[in-house]
Amino acid sequence: MQPLFFVKRGAFVNNLGEEIKDWIVSIVIAVVLAMIIRNFLVAPYLVDGPSMMPTLQNQQRLVVNRLIYRLREPEKGEILIFQYPKDPSRDFIKRVIAVPGDTIEIKDGNVFVNDELQTEDYILSKCRGDYPRVKIPEGHIFVMGDNRNNSEDSRFPDVGFVPFELIKGKAMVVFWPLADMKALP
């Protein structure tokens, strides 16, 4: 009587070796793709602190588009992540208030861009103090936190005008906690 099937000695070992090799190649490809996506396309970020309240809450998690500002310049009203100029290991999240060529001035807590009073329905309260009228230089932006009285931003010398090369990306979506999920401007 002949067996229904027959396996050459060692065929199982060869197939197992091929299977392991296929798994390793698949894992390496997945890791490389994940690194490319995270470094060049999108990345998760954690909101650390109250400077963007009420728009963003402390400990919320965001998806940040890392590609967009390689294709175009930031626009007023966008929320972005940038590298803190005084400490490259820290990232800040703020709103773009003025772009290159704009003038900005803060009088009696009111923000004026190009001599126009800004309607800012996203802030907690007007900021204390004034800021002299200045023109935003080319290749830089002026940023502020939505929680004006609890934000280290372009009004302070340690941040100042943010150079384009320090911008890491545009905040697109709050994804955690799930109850707070929303798209950002």
Describe each region flagged by the PLM.
Residues Q2-I20, V25, I36, F40-L46, ...:
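Soluble "head" domains of membrane/secretory-pathway proteins
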